Each structure stands twice: as structure tokens, then as C-alpha cells.
């Protein structure tokens, strides 16, 4: 495929003396740039008593540094360079993206890097109010979370932090102290547990010099060790009654292998066979032919060691059993029949184009390499696409069989009729 040749691009990977891995990804001609730090810190590394602490730390670093001791002062210093910072806490990583013009993004990065070495953590009580409001957005009047994604993950991975909500609990957030923040920062925010990826129309030497100034004296520390789930999921159906809503939120899910397993790439092919555009199987059958849902999606969420494959939909309460039946039928078809050549070729082409598009967006290019390296994936755009294209129809079918041939798990938040619950349970 000629497009594969277009995915080769310049890059430099190096390690600072303190163990921080740095990726430099030049994007000639692009006027915007991204300096992104990925830290292996998230809810899967927490305990019941510390659940939510990773998310709290992510909020609190924006409160300033010793040199810029307030949120306003920190943001002003960065925004004067035409840049801004975005951050996200996930299950297995926390990302910080300094986004700005290529001329000034490295200066903005150096300013923001101060918060990892010398955060001030001022205004914690004020920030707790914001965090409390964020959590309460997903709670019902009885204080129960109605986030179906959280409910599904808890169902798939019981008694393990992979089943925790990233935002934590109201009780934990109220109890956390500045000392807790400092302890968490000291454990996870260290050079050997992070990766810096910088993408833009920048000189490699300039990036390396800026990275050295910004992070060269960051403490080395130790990388985090994963604890792989060992407890089997035992509840095929869980539901939370949420009266008053017009629709029920559904997740039909399966446990999977992790991002480095042999089946990881075939599962990505399976994902795209099911849900890759409005012409894909899921949209065609569920929306166009059956009219069951307006919003429907499917995806493989692969962590370093394990993962999950979900079919998600919001449907009228009475249509929930039909939606579950269709999800089970469509995944069963993927497990028992090979995809037609024309369909597989379309999926391959669209994947190549989507990966090539990363070269146009520095932050997306940085994310591909930075988050991938944090998961232990030593791949490039070209090698990722080559391995995707190399998956034939039988290999995709076999991977689907290994996942969808196992127990399916259904989570639902909504006002399900009892008859609907019985129908769903009978399918499982």
C-alpha cells in the first residue's frame, strides 16, 4: 500500500540522565506545537482509601508553583506565550498538554514544568468544592453514581482498582489533605514514571535543551508496577434504576487481553469492522435498519495488561432487550464468520488515513507516541499501520471468537421494566 510510505517521519527518542524518556517529533510546516507529559498515574494505581487522589492531584497542580503561586499567575505566564494547558486523568495515565505556537511552546512548557517540581497546592478547600460538584454531576438523589461506564467497569473488574471511578468518592475528596497530595506526587510524579513527547515544527536540539532545563532536575524515582486483576467477574447483569429518564444507558461488555498481547491488533480490526463510520455494521443495523438508538458505539479499551470491549447505546427502556440481543448477535457473527474482502479493505484504508492524519495535528501525534510508550508499545505510525493491514479476515475472526465466545456482561442505568430485565438475564 503506497500510503504506508507516507507514514515515515522524523523522530528522536532519548533518555535524560534522570530517566525521563523524551520523544521529539518534528512536524515541518505546522504552526502549532504540543509538549505533552504522560505520567503513569491513574485510578488503577489507587486503593479504596485513595480512590480519586490521582484526579485531585491533576486539578491541584494548576493551582500554581513557587514562582507562580496562584492559578491566575500560572495561567497568565503561560497564556502570555500564546499557549494553554489541558489535562486529563484516566484509568492508567494522566496527561498534561501544553499547546501553543511553535515559536513559544517550549518556553510555556518550562513554565508549566515548575508545578511538578515545586507545586504550591494553595486553595485546596476551594478546589474541593469544584471536585465535589464534578462528582455530584454523576450522582442521583440517593448518592449513587449513574455513570454506566463506571458501573460496567466495576462489574468487569470486581475488587480491583480497574473498577474504580476516576473521580473517586465524595467522602475521599472531603478527607484528602495536602499531605496526601504531596505523598501521591512524590510516588508517581517522578522521571522514571513519565514520558515527555514534543511535536511541532521545532529543532530537535532546541527541544532537548528545553526538556533538560524543564525536567533535568526532576527526581528519578521508581516506575510503577502493575497489579493484574485476579478476581473473576461473576455478575453478568447489573442494573441501576434511574426513574425519570427518557432512555436507558446500556453497556454490553467483555473482558479482553491487554495492549501488548498478540490479539490486540486483531481486536482493533474487529472494533472497526463493527464501528468505523456511518457505513459500518453497528450503525447500519442498529440505527438505519432497526431504529433502536440514535447514539451507539463500540470499542476496545486496552490497558497494558488487560482490557474491555464494549458496545454502548442509549435506548428507550422497552427496547433494551432488543438492543442487547442485537449486540450479542452482531458480535457472534464476527466470531463465527470471516469479514468479506471488500469490507476488510475499506477498514484498512480508513485506518491508514486516520493514522496519516495524526501527522497534521501535533498534539495527536504526541499522544500516539507518548501514551503508547507508557503502555510499553515500541511502535511507530508505520509499524502500527503495517501490523493492522497484516491482520487477515481469519485472524480477526479468531480474536473475536476468543473474546465474544466468553461471558458477556450487561450493565444498565435506566427505568427498565421487570420483564425487560428477565429477558436480558435469559440471554446471558
Identify the meaning behind each predicted range:
Residues 2-7, 12, 158, 162, ...:
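An aromatic/glycine/proline-enriched structural segment found at the starts
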Residues 1-32:
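N- or domain-start disorder-to-order transition segments that initiate the globular core
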Residues 313-340:
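Extended amphipathic alpha-helical segments enriched in small hydrophobics
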Residues 39, 66-69, 73-184, 205, ...:
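Acidic/histidine-enriched segments that form metal/cofactor-coordinating
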Residues 19, 37, 55, 78, ...:
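Buried hydrophobic packing residues in well-ordered domains
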Residues 2-3, 9-11, 195-197, 348-428:
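C-terminal regions of mature proteins
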Residues 251-255, 274-315, 355:
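A structural supersecondary motif
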Residues 29, 34-99, 165, 273-292, ...:
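M16/MPP (pitrilysin/insulinase) zinc-metallopeptidase core fold and M16-derived inactive scaffolds
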Amino acid at each position: 500500500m503506497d500510503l504506508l510510505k507516507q507514514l515515515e517521519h522524523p523522530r528522536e527518542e532519548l533518555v535524560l540522565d534522570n530517566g525521563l524518556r523524551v520523544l521529539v517529533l518534528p512536524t515541518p510546516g505546522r504552526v502549532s506545537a504540543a509538549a505533552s507529559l504522560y505520567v503513569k498515574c491513574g485510578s488503577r494505581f489507587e486503593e479504596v482509601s485513595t480512590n480519586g487522589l490521582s484526579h485531585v492531584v491533576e486539578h491541584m497542580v494548576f493551582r500554581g508553583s513557587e514562582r507562580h503561586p496562584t492559578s491566575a499567575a500560572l495561567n497568565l505566564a503561560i497564556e502570555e506565550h500564546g499557549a494553554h494547558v489541558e489535562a486529563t486523568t484516566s484509568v492508567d495515565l494522566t496527561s498534561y498538554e501544553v499547546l501553543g505556537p511553535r515559536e513559544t511552546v517550549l518556553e510555556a512548557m518550562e513554565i508549566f514544568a515548575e508545578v511538578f517540581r515545586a507545586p504550591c497546592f494553595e486553595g485546596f478547600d476551594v478546589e474541593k468544592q469544584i471536585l465535589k460538584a464534578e462528582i455530584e454531576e454523576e450522582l442521583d438523589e440517593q448518592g449513587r453514581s449513574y455513570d454506566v461506564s463506571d458501573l460496567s467497569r466495576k462489574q468487569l473488574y470486581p475488587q480491583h482498582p480497574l473498577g474504580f471511578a476516576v473521580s473517586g468518592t465524595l467522602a475521599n475528596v472531603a478527607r484528602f489533605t495536602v499531605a496526601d497530595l504531596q505523598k501521591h506526587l512524590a510516588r508517581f510524579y517522578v522521571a522514571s514514571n513519565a514520558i515527555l513527547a514534543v511535536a511541532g515544527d521545532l529543532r530537535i536540539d532546541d527541544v532537548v535543551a528545553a526538556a533538560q532545563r524543564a525536567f533535568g532536575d526532576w527526581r528519578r524515582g521508581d516506575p510503577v508496577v502493575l497489579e493484574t486483576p485476579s478476581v473473576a467477574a461473576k455478575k453478568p447483569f447489573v442494573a441501576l434504576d434511574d426513574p425519570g429518564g427518557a432512555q436507558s444507558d446500556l453497556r454490553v461488555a467483555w473482558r479482553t487481553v491487554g495492549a501488548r498481547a498478540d490479539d490486540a491488533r486483531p481486536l482493533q480490526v474487529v472494533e472497526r469492522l463493527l464501528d468505523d463510520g456511518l457505513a459500518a455494521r453497528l450503525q447500519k443495523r442498529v440505527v438505519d435498519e432497526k431504529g433502536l438508538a440514535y447514539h451507539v458505539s463500540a470499542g476496545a479499551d486496552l490497558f497494558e495488561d488487560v482490557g474491555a470491549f464494549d458496545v454502548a447505546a442509549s435506548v428507550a427502556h422497552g427496547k433494551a432487550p432488543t438492543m442487547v440481543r442485537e449486540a450479542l448477535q452482531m458480535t457472534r457473527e464476527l466470531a463465527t464468520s470471516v469479514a468479506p474482502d471488500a469490507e476488510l479493505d475499506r477498514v484498512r484504508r480508513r485506518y491508514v488515513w486516520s493514522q496519516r492524519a495524526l501527522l497534521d495535528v501535533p498534539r495527536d501525534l504526541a499522544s500516539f507516541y507518548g501514551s503508547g510508550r507508557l503502555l510499553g508499545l515500541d511502535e511507530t505510525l508505520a509499524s502500527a499501520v503495517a501490523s493492522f493491514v497484516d491482520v487477515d479476515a481469519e485472524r480477526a475472526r479468531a480474536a473475536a471468537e476468543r473474546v465474544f465466545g466468553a461471558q458477556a456482561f450487561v450493565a444498565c442505568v435506566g427505568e427498565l421494566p421487570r420483564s425487560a430485565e428477565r429477558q436480558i438475564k435469559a440471554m446471558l
